[in-house]
Regions:
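A late C-terminal transmembrane helix in Major Facilitator Superfamily
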Residues: 321, 325-356
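C-terminal transmembrane helical hairpin of 12-TM major facilitator-type secondary transporters
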Residues: 268-317
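Conserved MFS/SLC helix-loop-helix module at the cytosolic interface between two early adjacent transmembrane helices
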Residues: 57-93
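Residue-level signature of mid-helix packing/kink "hotspots" within the transmembrane helices
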Residues: 24, 52-60, 142-143, 251-259, ...
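Extracytoplasmic gate region of multi-pass secondary transporters
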Residues: 26-27, 202-255
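Cytoplasmic helix-loop-helix junction between adjacent transmembrane helices
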Residues: 101-138
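Symmetry-related core transmembrane helices of the 12-TM Major Facilitator Superfamily/SLC fold
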Residues: 160-178, 362-378
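Helix-to-loop junctions at the C-terminal end of transmembrane segments
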Residues: 58-70, 257-269, 353
């Protein structure tokens, strides 16, 4: 990569890291909030769904406006907006105010992905590698969030965790304001990967797969910290911190998945790889809830590696099957289905947790994912 490409990747990667930190603090403190507000996991699950739905809904107009106002403006709106939303969360004294703050947080976080991914797909010569490195930053955000949430909650309060992330985005906004304008001086090369016609059928199939993958991932991430906390009660240490550290350990392995996805995605047929990934997700997701101890943690690590390998492959596949002018909207719709519609997995998981126990969420989510195998097989034939 040349200097300009590295510059773009650094800015987008930093924003990607903070996005996922913001979105995963809430799942990491579910048991704390359950006790503080005296509510069930089903109620908290639907609040997580509300935040995820806003995370998805905002991605569609964001994809459209990316081509109108540019990535710099959208990044600044994301950073400033999340600071405001976080302040609402920090001062919240009721469950409704907390839910409002989380909904606003999801909405402003939704701005990032279409802008960042479109910048990479248009201005990074090696898309698969760029998507992989960008994804690694997101994986770091996911991995750091439980530790940040658990540490601040244990030492201070859960509100301090959100306040810390607001400060991080404030610093990031300063860097964006002063450094990103240099992108205006760049000469944007004609997109040599430009697809003349969008493959609509392939795109519909990909979006459909994204819904199922999103549902299962939302259920997984929302209740994994709680599951680990409850399954390791005999271990020493703070329950919140213990669940956070184990969750971070598992999610950190997503970096391996990102690297593998970037490596194989640039060498083999992306649609075929996607099919294999969907198939492998099913058994390892189920095993998280069907096993205990080290086998449970090992199953979680393998699942995360497999699941996260899809991101660079899937994002590159969208670039392959969409016309360049439609790409921002294409990414926006993709994230709407994956994070918005898929976000209902948190609500479904909450209902399962209240009626059958947290451990049953994971095999249930693996069953929900089975139709995606057939859709991935059809996609393989359409690309």
């Amino acid at each position: 990569m040349n200097r300009d490409e590295k510059f773009i990747l650094t800015i987008t990667a930093g924003s990607h890291l903070s996005v996922h930190c913001f979105m995963l603090v809430f799942p990491s403190i579910l048991l704390v909030l359950k006790n503080e507000f005296s509510v069930g996991l089903d109620v908290l699950g639907f609040i997580a769904t509300l935040s995820a739905l806003m995370f998805g809904i905002g991605a569609i107009p964001s994809g459209y406006f990316e081509s109108k106002v540019g990535g710099r403006v959208l990044l600044l709106i994301y950073q400033a907006g999340t600071i405001v939303a976080t302040m609402v969360i920090v001062i919240s004294q009721s469950l409704w105010m907390l839910a409002t703050g989380l909904a606003l947080l999801g909405l402003f976080c939704s701005i990032y992905h279409p802008a960042g991914l479109t910048l990479i797909s248009r201005r990074i010569s090696n898309i698969s590698k760029g998507m992989a490195l960008h994804g690694i930053a997101g994986s770091l955000g996911l991995a750091l969030a439980p530790v940040i949430a658990a540490s601040f909650t244990t030492l201070f309060s859960w509100r301090a965790a959100y306040g810390f992330l607001a400060f991080v985005n404030f610093v990031l906004a300063i860097f964006t304001f002063f450094l990103v304008p240099k992108m205006k001086k760049m000469i944007v090369k004609e997109d040599h990967r430009n697809t003349k016609v969008t493959n609509k059928m392939a795109l519909i199939l990909y979006y459909s797969i994204g819904i199922f993958m999103g549902i299962t991932f939302a259920g997984f991430t929302t209740f994994l910290p709680t599951h680990f906390t409850l399954q390791t009660v005999e271990w020493s240490g703070s329950p919140t911190l213990r669940g956070g550290i184990l969750t971070s350990l598992v999610l950190l392995s997503g970096i391996i998945g990102q690297l593998l996805g970037g490596y194989f995605g640039s060498r083999f047929d992306k649609a075929y790889l996607l099919f294999i990934i969907v198939v492998l997700n099913v058994p390892f997701l189920a095993l998280i809830g069907l096993t205990s101890g080290m086998m449970m943690i090992f199953s979680g690590i393998i699942f995360v590696i497999v699941h996260f390998s899809m991101q660079p492959i899937g994002n590159s596949l969208i670039a392959q099957i969409t016309q360049s002018n439609h790409r921002g909207v294409g990414y926006g719709i993709s994230f709407f289905f994956s994070f918005g519609a898929g976000g209902f997995g948190a609500g479904i998981g909450g209902l399962i947790a209240e009626h059958f126990g947290v451990a049953k969420i994971f095999p249930a989510m693996s069953i929900i994912l089975i139709p995606a195998i057939g859709l991935a097989w059809l996609l393989k034939k359409k690309v």
